[in-house]
């Protein structure tokens, strides 16, 4: 790996494919450098984890209900004993509305992507076609050096 990496290849491939699967060294640090380069190139980044996402399509693009952890407490009403359902706005729409005027778009960077199912990965592969301002980067696993490929190719390999 080069001593100083500009990140131009990653940015070029992200704009070309729309969704990338990355393999990062397990000691970490490299993904932060590439996120910084994406921000310097005019993108806004949203860093989330794949664990606990639930229905990925609903979480990202639709109003969805969540229940807070009940911590052993029961509600006194006649509803479910696990608590009230709170409805949250779609996370992508909320962030796209807040983009600066000169921003190139939103990069959704998902860590721990190895736990996502093939259907979820297929949806995330097609997400940049549904919303052109959104690009997707998913950490698919570890490697000795930081490398990336189109998310569609990582889907075929799994």
From Swiss-Prot:
- According to its UniProt record, the EC number is 7.1.1.-
What Pfam families does the database record attribute to this sequence? NdhN
The chemistry this enzyme catalyses reads: a plastoquinone + NADH + (n+1) H(+)(in) = a plastoquinol + NAD(+) + n H(+)(out); a plastoquinone + NADPH + (n+1) H(+)(in) = a plastoquinol + NADP(+) + n H(+)(out)
What GO cellular component is one of the record's annotations? Answer: plasma membrane-derived thylakoid membrane
Q: Which membrane topology term applies here?
A: Peripheral membrane protein
Q: Which InterPro entries match?
A: NAD(P)H-quinone_OxRdtase_su_N
Primary site of residence: membrane
List the disulfide bonds in this chain. none
Q: Which UniProt keywords apply?
A: Membrane, NAD, NADP, Plastoquinone, Quinone, Thylakoid, Translocase, Transport
* Self-association state and partner proteins as the record states: NDH-1 can be composed of about 15 different subunits; different subcomplexes with different compositions have been identified which probably have different functions.
Q: What does this protein do?
A: NDH-1 shuttles electrons from an unknown electron donor, via FMN and iron-sulfur (Fe-S) centers, to quinones in the respiratory and/or the photosynthetic chain. The immediate electron acceptor for the enzyme in this species is believed to be plastoquinone. Couples the redox reaction to proton translocation, and thus conserves the redox energy in a proton gradient. Cyanobacterial NDH-1 also plays a role in inorganic carbon-concentration.
In which family does this protein belong, per the annotation? Belongs to the complex I NdhN subunit family.
Q: What is this protein called?
A: NAD(P)H-quinone oxidoreductase subunit N
Species whose genome carries this gene: Nostoc punctiforme (strain ATCC 29133 / PCC 73102)
Taxonomic lineage of this organism?
A: Bacteria, Bacillati, Cyanobacteriota, Cyanophyceae, Nostocales
- The gene is ndhN
């Amino acid at each position: 790996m080069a001593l100083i990496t500009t990140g131009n290849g990653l940015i070029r491939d992200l704009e070309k494919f729309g969704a990338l699967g990355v393999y990062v060294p397990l000691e970490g640090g490299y993904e932060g450098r590439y996120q910084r380069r994406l921000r310097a190139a005019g993108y806004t980044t949203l860093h989330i984890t794949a664990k606990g996402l639930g229905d990925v399509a609903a979480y990202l693009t639709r109003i969805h209900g969540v229940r807070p952890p009940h911590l052993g407490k029961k509600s006194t009403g006649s509803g479910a004993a696990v608590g009230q359902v709170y409805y949250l706005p779609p996370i992508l729409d909320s962030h796209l509305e807040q983009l600066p005027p000169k921003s190139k778009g939103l990069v959704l960077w998902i860590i721990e992507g190895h736990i996502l199912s093939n259907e979820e990965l297929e949806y995330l592969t097609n997400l940049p076609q549904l919303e052109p301002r959104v690009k997707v980067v998913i950490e698919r696993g570890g490697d000795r050096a930081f490398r990336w490929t189109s998310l569609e190719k990582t889907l075929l390999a799994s």
